[in-house]
Amino acid sequence: MKLMETLNQCINAGHEMTKAIAIAQFNDDSPEARKITRRWRIGEAADLVGVSSQAIRDAEKAGRLPHPDMEIRGRVEQRVGYTIEQINHMRDVFGTRLRRAEDVFPPVIGVAAHKGGVYKTSVSVHLAQDLALKGLRVLLVEGNDPQGTASMYHGWVPDLHIHAEDTLLPFYLGEKDDVTYAIKPTCWPGLDIIPSCLALHRIETELMGKFDEGKLPTDPHLMLRLAIETVAHDYDVIVIDSAPNLGIGTINVVCAADVLIVPTPAELFDYTSALQFFDMLRDLLKNVDLKGFEPDVRILLTKYSNSNGSQSPWMEEQIRDAWGSMVLKNVVRETDEVGKGQIRMRTVFEQAIDQRSSTGAWRNALSIWEPVCNEIFDRLIKPRWEIR
């Protein structure tokens, strides 16, 4: 069998498998089939809205809120919980929805590393969904990653639903004046995505040539920042997922970000890999005019293990000694639920009761991601815009 024939068979079989997984999970392989079926109990909803459970009951009784969805369990009628849409409506009724001030640019959070397998996309996706769960308007951007994993999490399968013209590529190459054409909705209210596909790798070979031809409106390394500026007014926060490399695309992510989060597993070789990332990034940026776009850098320890014999606690101590306040307080502990979430095409924030491995495993995963996302919000996002 010739190589091209082999590759075509692999590609076709891979697309069919992806479709089959989506159909098994959502009864359809279209992005529109993605639904959040999770319901939040009244106490959980109250915490998200920022009021008491009694305040919600009183508002429902007074007609300020709709009567809650109910179901019969045995002989008892009980609440089935609230959808995220209903929770956002509560925020509007109680006046607790968070918004940045109109005259403040939305914080841009970039997540980058120069190797795969460090939970980079998991961090980007969980952070974006957590911010949407908080009621914010969020744009998740596949800045330069042709793999499109963040897109797949939200039902947009690269090279099946998404092609070159649907990505940032036309803007990068000077063919579009803004990026509204590339924005796609997700099943999360308030969360949009700019997806990617394999064609996005062309920026590494074509971007500099377009600049030399005078076809770009700004310097090549500032194109992503310019892209974000064309749509920033519609969002409270922007999250960028980066490719695991140090090409011109990653330089764009660095220059577009207000905060650059570098996921770093608490293992020796991964620590040295992060050090190499900083070393190479410094060398690449030596002769680049950043035009004032210089992000704050933070380290997020990932794949942390508390098991007997694990090197994670020792490595955490070394990393904190070396990088001090750059290292975030919370860590992403290792859990099988991250991998299982990929198979389910759902993060821990989306999973309904019947979509979890077990209640205990789900709660453990939630206890990992919530503190991490809350710390990023409280320390790195809130200070950058006024909350009204």
From Swiss-Prot:
CDD domains in alphabetical order: ParAB_family
Protein biosynthesis recorded as keyword: no
Pfam families from the UniProt entry: AAA_31
Nucleotidyltransferase is among the record's keywords: no
Lineage, top ranks: Bacteria, Pseudomonadati, Pseudomonadota, Gammaproteobacteria, Enterobacterales
Role: This protein is essential for plasmid partition. It ensures the proper distribution of newly replicated plasmids to daughter cells during cell division. SopA is trans-acting.
Matches recorded under PANTHER family: P-LOOP CONTAINING NUCLEOSIDE TRIPHOSPHATE HYDROLASE, PARA FAMILY PROTEIN CT_582
Protein name: Protein SopA
Family per similarity comment: Belongs to the ParA family.
Keywords: Plasmid, Plasmid partition
Gene Ontology biological-process annotations: plasmid partitioning
Superkingdom of the organism of origin: Bacteria
